[in-house]
Amino acid sequence: MANLTKLKIVTPYAQILEKDVYSVELKTSEGRITVLPDHNPLMSTIENHVAYIRELPNTPRKPLLLLDGIVYIEQHQVRVFSDYFKFLDEIQIDEINSSLNQLKHDLNNEEDDKKKLQLKSKIKLNESILIAYKDR
C-alpha cells in the first residue's frame, strides 16, 4: 500500500472533505505546489484555483475548485480552510450563472442595507467560482 496523506478541507458552509490521498496540488500565494507524503511542514495562503488530488500514485488526478483560504501542511496531513470547495464535476455553471443573474436583479431592487450586503457577498462568491472555474 502506498504511503498516504490525510487531506481535510473545511469551509464556513460546513462543506467537509476528509480522505486519504497520495498527492494534493494547490495554488498558493507563492505559486503552485504538490504535496506528497512526508512533506515538510508548511503554512501558506491559497488563492482561487482548481486544485488536484490523486488518491494513489498511478491514478488520475481529480480536480476540485478551491477559493481563498489557508493550508497547513504537516508530515502526513494537509488541512485546508477555504471559503468554498467543490469537485469540478459537481459544479453546474449554468446554475451558477442563473443564480448570479438573479442575485444581481435582487440587489438592484433591494432597499435594506443589511440584505444588500448579504446579496453582494453571495454575488462575490459566485463570481469567484466562475473565475476560478474558467482558469482551470
Curated annotation (Swiss-Prot):
GO terms for cellular component: plasma membrane; proton-transporting ATP synthase complex. It is found in: Cell membrane. It comes from the Bacteria. Keywords: ATP synthesis, Cell membrane, CF(1), Hydrogen ion transport, Ion transport, Membrane, Transport. The keyword Transport applies. CDD domains: F1-ATPase_delta. InterPro entries: ATP_synth_F1_dsu/esu, ATP_synth_F1_dsu/esu_N, ATPsynth_dsu/esu_N. It holds the Pfam family ATP-synt_DE_N. GO terms for molecular function: ATP binding; proton-transporting ATP synthase activity, rotational mechanism. The keyword Manganese does not apply. Produces ATP from ADP in the presence of a proton gradient across the membrane. F-type ATPases have 2 components, CF(1) - the catalytic core - and CF(0) - the membrane proton channel. CF(1) has five subunits: alpha(3), beta(3), gamma(1), delta(1), epsilon(1). CF(0) has three main subunits: a, b and c. This is ATP synthase epsilon chain. It comes from Ureaplasma parvum serovar 3 (strain ATCC 700970).
